[in-house]
Structures are given as structure tokens and as C-alpha cells.
């Protein structure tokens, strides 16, 4: 037997253990296995940067599930991989390129930039995989996937080809969210609003040839005056009188239910509306009539005639009652433009500068164009008031720059049927979402059935597999189509084509475009298509398109692989709520479309980890904790157990974040101010250290502080407790002989341990099945620490030293440790594997009632199954009371500062039934509480010099004789404090029970419990008062 170290040195042991698992292929899945399958796909981390604790939580929870299923006999596949994260990764690399070399992607060119991004990907993928491995994730590392690798790429091409053939993919000109920094469209889900200080500009457009009595100008207002260069109309409401009436009716309806303060405000609004009706309504009616006559306005600065139109988008109750219409740069105006058949004039280049449609302002950036347009309007005398105003500005989540609505040609996925299929899957519970409250967000998002814009104007990603040529006459398009049909015969199932409208030529004749989709990445097919004059689309696909295929693409689809047959659909998905719609919903609809089955049957949405200030952790904020920093300080098992213990079903987790001074190891709380500093001085030792924000050579030369959280201290202590108790057990197994045991004849403490193991096994298994990881961790912690280590091991010590009892005691305690290691292994894999290895050298054959050979790894051992025949509720109740009494005696000893070597006389008043339960336990009070029980039962009375604790939950009073130990003044102080606490509690209960409303409305059983609780408190108070009198008589 190898020597058992006094400490578990995770830094030395974890890598050895992980390598042993790898060498034994413990986590490698066999698709030919006869075992039932259980598969999980990892939410692939983005290669934008390293992982933080949010990823740590996500992967720990997945690993708990996977390890337990592996131990339960399933053929488990946990598919690892990373995501290319198109827009996010390109944004990071482009920003770095600009900061370090003052270059743009256009300076480098497509191929060179993509090479740079591949280098970034390789660097961070290696780091991410390293982090995951050090956390102990038991993925099948031989099957590592990447969303841009050839296997995933084949699935992307096959999916796009299928949707194109079904006409579920189409090209259209739509208003998109345009990121001018990255020069690409971003989805609505990648946009956030930020409040900025801005202005509301009022200016006038001249009416062309106004008739007598007609207004000469129409006044409009906007926060974006530069967009007026793309205006194609001004709208007025078609029935302004009715619209104002409707607004007033709404206000009066609110008034009927308003309080006094609200009523004042509403009456002011009604008065203002009535005044507006008098002052503005006649002109609005006049403008409405002018619109009906087809009258025109002159757009200043570009001298373009624009329409005056009647449309309900105009709000007569606001501003002038008229609204400028810029269909190419505002989503609402775009809808007006569709309804009114207006021209759509895009005034922006892709980089956010004004294009030729901006006339004299072409080439200016948006801020400069805004100032120039306002100045030009002022010079023409057309500028009105300029109001200060706070404005909600949309920003790109990727580049953090303002979004511009932008009219562009994009590829879309038609979502109607696909979205409905994903909704049905959740509605009929083929996919269940836990907690169930997240179902609504999933269904609401899909119910909008918004078509999905999937093209991105980027260079990093899956290039859209479409080749096209436009500007063709119908005859030219038909001739080209015929050539493509011949080509398709030469390349079966590889080419799909479509002829679409493409606008008009210089003569005003309609033109056509031919689009070809190629299924596979085949240079020969692509060359043949390009030889016909078609060119590939330069755009790439939205990252989420490839991510949506992850559960089946990673298994080799569209090829019918053994892995796909065995492991699809996967069993469960564990992820964050942030991507429930962006990713989870799309995986469901793509799985149904491609494979015909849902990709998983259950989805668990885990809480988010927040810092101590309640903010989401992220590297960009400086509050993101690297799991490796926690592992280096506390160990991987402490990281995992700490995270599992925090994983609740209902709320996000706050975790205070600290810097660890590299000089004195003092933890310094992060604040919003210091978390952004490049360096700082430690408030404890005064020595400087750098942070992740260090940029100057001076800062970088300082030792760097790790970012950690003290919340893992308790978990590290638990690891140490488990190791120490395990070491004690194994050191007392000399001469171990596996023995068949008759459970019924075992000593009571052994039967208690077996019963508790059965109960805990059932509770932990149920909790993990319900994704209640925090509950599983809590139960295991309490059992391991309080019951196995602190109670059972202590009780067993005398028997382990007694030759006549040692063999049975060794067999039972070895079995108890064995079962505890199996239960804890999914959460704490490294320390349990290390103990298992040592235990296997001492007791390779063990178990109760029948010993059996065990394998070399706890990772592949069977997970415990609750043995109902071992369950004994009477014994568990015995020990529960016993534990509470021991705790009470220990509390009294501590309060009196009684030395550990001293034995105290104790008396225990309890019911006759409790006396029967506790009588066999009296011998153990000496070992566990340093107490000699002199009296036990209903007639037990207090000692003359008595310390007393009541245990109302079990109707027990614990008395300790303090004649030899008492500090009268200290004990009086303690009792008087307790007397005050009890008096306060009694007053509260009496007030509650004297409240007629509570007594009459609360359920009868609740009222009765309150009365019983009051009676118990009053009994305790009487006993404390008697104890006080006794002690006072000794003064």
C-alpha cells in the first residue's frame, strides 16, 4: 500500500488523475455499445476569449449529470467543441488590429484577416480546452468539434441547400440593424439600448405652389436631422379629428380610475389636447386634403420633390402632427414606405459615411453631417427650435457602437413553418424546459415568426453557398438556367437554382438574376458554375445558423454515422437563459427540419453568476473570474462544489469578487472604481500589483493579481475534511478482510449509517434528476461532514481499536466511505478518485452485505442505488435526536469554556418514547460530547448548579452539571440574554394570536401550530427563569 499523504495536494494530483482517465478512455463513447445512450452537447464557448465563472458553472452542472449517468451504466457522450462566433470574434480581432497597428480589415484584405482570426482562434481554443480540462469536465476529447471544421461545414451547406430548395431561404431588400464599425447587419437580439443626451430638431419643408389660404411650410421634428436627405414623404393623419378624439377618450377613461395626483396630470393633458384641437386641427385637416390631391413638398438641400401622404403613422396629438418619412433609415418609416409605395433612398455607405445621395454632404460621417445639415437649414431660414432631450439609442452588442437602420440586400430564412414546429415541440412537451417559467419567453419569441436575416457582411464564418449573376433579360436568364440544368445532371444532388426579379435596366425594362446554391464544398462543381459567369456571394452566415445545427452536425449529419444513430437525439441541454431564443429555439427547429426529431428532450436553464455588485460577470467589465485562478488557489473540487452549491433553480447568484494580492495574498474587494484600474497598491501590505488592464510597461512589470472569490473557502474546507476523514478510515483498515454481514444483527450505529446512506442516495439522485444541484450539494455536505465524518467515524473509533469488533467495523466503515465517494464523485471528481485509489489498495473487495471486487476508477464505478431494506426511520429518528443533544452539550461546554479533557455530568429530560430510542446511545455521549449521562427520561430533573438548553423540536431538555466548571456571572449573562430573546418571541406570538383577522382567516392547523409554539416558548421561559433564580442564590 502506498503512503497516504497528510494533505490532498490538488496541484500535484489533479493532472495525474486526469491523465489516468484519458489513458483508460473513461469518457470515450462507443457507438457500438449495447448500453443505453445518454448524450449531451456542450454549449460551445466562443473563441473570443477565455472562460469565466459563468462557463465554470455551466460546465460543472453538465459534468455532474454526465458523470452520474456514466456511473449508472449509460454509454455517455459529452460532445465538446467551440464556436467560431463570427461577428464577435472578427470584432475582437479588428479592434486589436486597429489599436496595435492602426489598420482596418480592408488594409489587410480578406485572406490575411481570416488568417489572423484563425491564429486567434487557435490560441484561445487551446486556452478554453485547457480550462475545461482543469475543471475536470469528462468530455469525449477525441471528438472535439469546431463550428467551422469540415464536419460542421458539411452540415451547414446541406442545411442551406435544403432550405433553398424548399424556398425557405430567400433574398430580399430589408431594413436591417447596421453596425457601421463592423460593416455588417446584426439581429434584433444583438442590439441593446443606451440613453444618451441629444436634441430634438424642428424644421420646415416648403409646400410647392401653395394655393391661397394653404400653409406655405410643413413643420416636422426629428432627433436625426441628417436623415432628411433620404426623406421621400411627409405624412399627416387621414382623420386627425377622430385620432384626437380617440386620444382624449383614452385619457378620460384613465381619469375615471385615477387618484388625486394622477387626476391633476391627466386633466392637464386633456386641456392641452383641447387646445391643440383648436390650434392645429384645422391645418391638419387642410394638409390631409392636400395629401389627397397629390400635393408635393420640396425637400431642402437636395431640392427633391417629395409626397405629402395620409398615413396613420402620423400622430396629430404630437409635435406639429406631421412626420417625415425616411423609409431606408427608420423601421416605422419603412412600413409607411411599403404601404404608400414610396421610393426608398439609402443615404449611407456601409462605413456610416454619407453616400452620393447625400449631395453636398457626401463623404461626411453621421455626426459631421448632422451639424452640417442643421447649419445649412439655419442658413436657409428653415430651422426652428432645438430642444435638449435624452434619447434611447440602439447599440451593437458586438462593437458597442451606435446602430443605423440600413436598407440592404440580405438572405432570410422564412420562419413561419419552422417556428411553428419548434413551438409545437414545447407545447406538446417533446421538449420540456426547466424551470417551467422560461417556456413563455421561448414561445413568445417564436410566435412572432419574424423571418431570420442570416447573411452577415463579414469575412469570418461560413461563406454563403450561393453563386449569382444579375442584370439579365428573361431570355438570358432562361438560357443560363438551361446550362445549369445540364450541369446539375453532371453533378447530381449538388446544384439548385432559382430565377428572381432583379430590378430594371437603364431603359426601364425588368431584369432577372439567377441564383445557384451548391450543396457540398466541391471545387470542381464551383469552378463549373463560375465558368458560366456566376460569382459567389461575399457574405457569411449568421453564427447562430451553424450553432443551430450543433446537436446533429457534431455527430456527422448529413452522413448517417454510427454516432448519429446511437446518440441523437441527445438527452438534455444545460444552458443560460441569455440564449434560450437565439440558440435553443433554433436548435429545436433545425433538428426537426433536418433529422425529423427534436435535438433533446429536456432543457435546464441555470442561474447567472453576478458579482458582489449584482452585475453580470464579464471580462470586459473586469469582474470576470477565471476558473483557473480559483483552481490555483482552492483546487478544482472546491471550484466545482462551490459552484454546485450555489446553483439554485430560482435566482441568480451573487458572488463577491476580489483581487488577490500577489505579495501578501490578501483579498481586496472589487469596486466599480478599482476593477478598472491598471494597477493599485495593496491596502494590507502596501505593495503595488497590476491587473488585467495593465498596458504600460511600468504596470506590466508589476506582479499580477488574480481575480478570485472567497465563496470557495468553505468548499476547500470540505475537501480537506473529506480527505482527513478518509485518511483516518484507511489508516484504521490494517488487516482488512472482506466479510459477508447480516445487516439485521449489526450494531445500531452501523444500521443507522446504512439507513442514512439509503436516504441520502435517494435524495441526492432525485435532486440531480430535477436539476436541483444546490440541494444535492447541501445534502451531501451535511451528510459527509456532520454525519459520516463528525459522528459515525467518531463512534466507530473504539470498535476499530477493539480486536473483537474491528472486522465488522472495518467492513461497514469501508463500505460507508466507498458509497460516499461514489455519491460525491460527480461533483468532486479529483479528491474522490484519489481516495478511491488508496482505498482500492487496502480494500479492493468491499461492500455490505456482500463484498465485491471494485474497479480501478470511481469514475466508472456504479452510482449508489437506495436500498430500501436498509432504511430504518426509527433509527434515523434516534440518531437525529442524539445528534441534537450532542450539539446542545457541546454548545454548553463551549459557552462555559470547559476543557476538552474534562467529562461533564449530563441529564436528559425526554418523553418515554424518546427514552426508549436514546437508551442504547448513552455510551456514545462520552466519545462525542465528553459527557456522562446520569439520567435519561421523563422524570429527569435539573442539577443544583445547572446549565440548560431546551430542544423544543424534539421535546427534550438537556442539563449539564456545572458544579465544578461554572462561571456564575457568565452563565447568568447567557441566561438573561436568552430570557430576553424568549420574552420577545412570546410577545410576538401573543400579538399574532390576539389579531382577530389572523385567527379567523388563517387555516386552523396554522393557528394551532402558533398556539403550540407559544406554549413551548412559555415553558422554556419558565425553565430559564428557574435556572436564573438558582444561580442568583449562589452569588
From Swiss-Prot:
Residue ranges that the Swiss-Prot or TrEMBL entry lists as coiled coil: 253-281, 967-1035
Gene: valS
Lineage top rank: taxon: Bacteria
Biological function: Catalyzes the attachment of valine to tRNA(Val). As ValRS can inadvertently accommodate and process structurally similar amino acids such as threonine, to avoid such errors, it has a 'posttransfer' editing activity that hydrolyzes mischarged Thr-tRNA(Val) in a tRNA-dependent manner.
Pfam families reported in the protein's UniProt record: Anticodon_1, tRNA-synt_1, Val_tRNA-synt_C
Enzyme class: ligase
Subunit structure: Monomer.
Organism: Rhodopirellula baltica (strain DSM 10527 / NCIMB 13988 / SH1)
Known EC number: 6.1.1.9
Binding site for ATP: 619
Motif window: 'HIGH' region: 45-55
Record's protein name: Valine--tRNA ligase
Compartment list: Cytoplasm
Biological processes annotated in GO: valyl-tRNA aminoacylation
Annotated keywords: Aminoacyl-tRNA synthetase, ATP-binding, Coiled coil, Cytoplasm, Ligase, Nucleotide-binding, Protein biosynthesis
Reactions that this protein is recorded to catalyse: tRNA(Val) + L-valine + ATP = L-valyl-tRNA(Val) + AMP + diphosphate
Entry's family note: Belongs to the class-I aminoacyl-tRNA synthetase family. ValS type 1 subfamily.
GO annotation, cellular component aspect: cytosol
Free-text comment about domains: ValRS has two distinct active sites: one for aminoacylation and one for editing. The misactivated threonine is translocated from the active site to the editing site. The C-terminal coiled-coil domain is crucial for aminoacylation activity.
SUPFAM superfamilies: Anticodon-binding domain of a subclass of class I aminoacyl-tRNA synthetases, Nucleotidylyl transferase, tRNA-binding arm, ValRS/IleRS/LeuRS editing domain
